[in-house]
């Protein structure tokens, strides 16, 4: 997915507009296990298919794994201010993990520009969600 390059004076015209969704990404057990190792979060619902099955039908991804993936998925179709040298993560608001993401789910990110503030050149806020099944699983 291509990035969209925008002149600073055009940023306001993107408020309320959705960007192209990211590519689909499969959340397989290897990715979940690697995240468990990196974060030292080996709760059985993430890493033990047999124990997790009666509760969720399978293992589920860590909520923070889904959240962490938004960084890379957001880069696929980012809104880039012309002349900027880089972008930084300013933070997230109102993060909610709305539904589990079962192993082997496919997720992607939908981004919508909700506000433009001239705090610093090229700085704006986005609302994003990660969807893998029939409903949004992550809102931030």
Sequence positions of predicted segments:
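A generic structural signal for short beta-strands and their flanking turns/coil linkers
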Residues: 21-23, 31, 84-93, 107, ...
């Amino acid at each position: 997915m291509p990035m969209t390059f925008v002149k600073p004076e055009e940023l306001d015209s993107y408020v309320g507009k959705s960007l192209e969704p990211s590519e689909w990404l499969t959340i397989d057990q290897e990715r979940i296990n690697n995240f468990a190792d990196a974060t030292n979060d080996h709760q059985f619902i993430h890493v033990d298919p047999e124990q997790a099955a009666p509760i969720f039908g399978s293992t589920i991804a860590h909520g923070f794994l889904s959240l962490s993936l938004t960084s890379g998925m957001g880069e696929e179709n980012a809104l880039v201010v012309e002349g900027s040298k880089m972008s930084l993560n300013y933070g997230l608001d109102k993060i909610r993990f709305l539904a589990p993401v079962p192993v082997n789910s496919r997720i992607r990110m939908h981004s919508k520009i909700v506000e433009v503030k001239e705090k610093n050149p090229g700085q704006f806020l986005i609302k994003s969600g990660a969807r893998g099944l029939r409903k949004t699983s992550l809102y931030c």
